[in-house]
């Protein structure tokens, strides 16, 4: 059950992001964009701890960029193959809904950037992205890309992602006025 409240965000447009490496994009967004607090936590009955989490968001001519910032108890990144159950690890999730579409897009990432991604009309019937589709998603993880077992203690990490408009069926030259996300 989610405890989030709808909030409208305006994404800033930065065409130069497409010519920067992902670490530089992360630094740019940190300096130029407002951080938005993530107050939603899934699986409350299974996990009683809520990490501090925030994100920045912007777009370019080709991508939607989201930089997640997380600080929490323990850190885990065991899953390292596409569409593996990254929700078992330290992870973040991003949903997108395109106007006039019955489907929504679900992107789950663990702290090393492993992705479990799909599009679907309902939770029960996902169409998983292929390895070729997932390869189009740019990722930069402050934890690196090597899997590791759970590390105890307080840890901070960030994950910078870039999702191509073409992957989610949008024409970057004719974007809709509104894209829903959470």
Functional labels for PLM-detected ranges:
Residues 1-182:
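Structural preference for beta-rich elements and adjacent junctions enriched in aromatics
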């Amino acid at each position: 059950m989610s405890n989030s409240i709808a909030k409208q965000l305006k994404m800033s447009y930065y065409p130069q992001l497409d010519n920067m490496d992902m670490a530089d994009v992360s630094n740019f967004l940190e300096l130029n964009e407002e951080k938005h607090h993530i107050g939603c936590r899934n699986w409350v009955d299974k996990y009683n701890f809520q990490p501090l989490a925030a994100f920045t968001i912007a777009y370019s001519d080709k991508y939607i960029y989201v930089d997640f910032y997380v600080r929490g108890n323990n850190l885990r990144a065991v899953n390292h193959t596409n569409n593996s159950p990254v929700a078992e690890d330290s992870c973040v999730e991003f949903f997108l809904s395109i106007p006039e579409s019955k489907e929504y897009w679900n992107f789950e990432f663990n702290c090393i950037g492993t992705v479990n991604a799909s599009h679907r009309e309902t939770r029960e019937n996902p169409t998983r992205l292929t390895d070729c589709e997932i390869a189009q998603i740019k990722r930069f993880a402050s934890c690196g890309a090597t899997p590791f077992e759970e590390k105890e203690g307080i840890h901070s990490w960030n994950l910078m992602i870039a999702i191509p408009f073409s992957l989610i069926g949008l024409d970057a030259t004719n974007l809709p006025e509104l894209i829903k996300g959470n």
